[in-house]
């Protein structure tokens, strides 16, 4: 697949300067997003509960996402408020205000809730009551969720560095410099942390597995090779969290490829041309990607063979895909939640979540989907 000069120009404005296509100041110059198509609703979407936890700064809507552990959902907002919600009814179990500008989170691991700040601070909170366990300082702004395996906390920073902090004290154990290029998409990949591996994507298009104890390299794989004469053309960032399914890792780059790799060795199993800054999703033996220009695509997980593409949400600023029961869900900047059939990608359901729009990655919890809107409302949906 090739990406047009138009797409490159549009996306450079969208991701680097933070422009939006809905409600812009210069309506004559704006490129019009796709109108919503009419279709027959095949599923009934039920709102289980909704709770307000605070609003998101426009620059950090993509990086503040909910996370879950057991019967609790943890959320955060840009003003430093971190909230624990009961997963069954959305009621607040606790809420604390850190009085800092939170830019990345929320992460969970080993009984801790973790967030990062604009100033490069990492906060670890007790998941039972929100009390601060420790704080730590890293090199720069944190716009991804810290992750922990109970021994370390992995934190990626906007200058493309990876830090491993002691999970008990917050002290630095090791760090890795991703050697960031001159120009990159604003965003960082979220690490996947297990007992024997820290898996991280970098702005160079490399996916790297580290020993969590000392940071030594286990393997390194390049998903995409920078091409072109300009720095803009050569951007191949990995900004979406790698997806681990059994012994296979799925990851996608901007202006590059979607790939499946062996967890143990990093050996490539298949590649397909693709471009995305979202994490892929997996369901029913297929991998789903929200690509730039907001096409949603499905690939066979085993071979990478393309299955379908839905281009009817062009430039609606979609979230990454998520699973909701037997459907694939994406949300957009106008606040609509769209459900697609995993077999051929046609629309099967739609509901208006909130007029403020949805930017944060959505969270699948069992048969429910947790959606955090830009105005700070957190809502749980399921199919009737």
Where are these regions (language model features)?
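Short coil/turn segments within WD40 beta-propeller repeats
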Residues: 80, 120-121, 160, 205, ...
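Bacterial signal peptide processing site
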Residues: 20-23
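Short loop/turn segments that connect beta-strands within beta-propeller blades
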Residues: 86-89, 126-129, 166-169, 212-214, ...
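C-terminal motif of bacterial Sec signal peptides marking the signal peptidase cleavage site
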Residues: 16-18
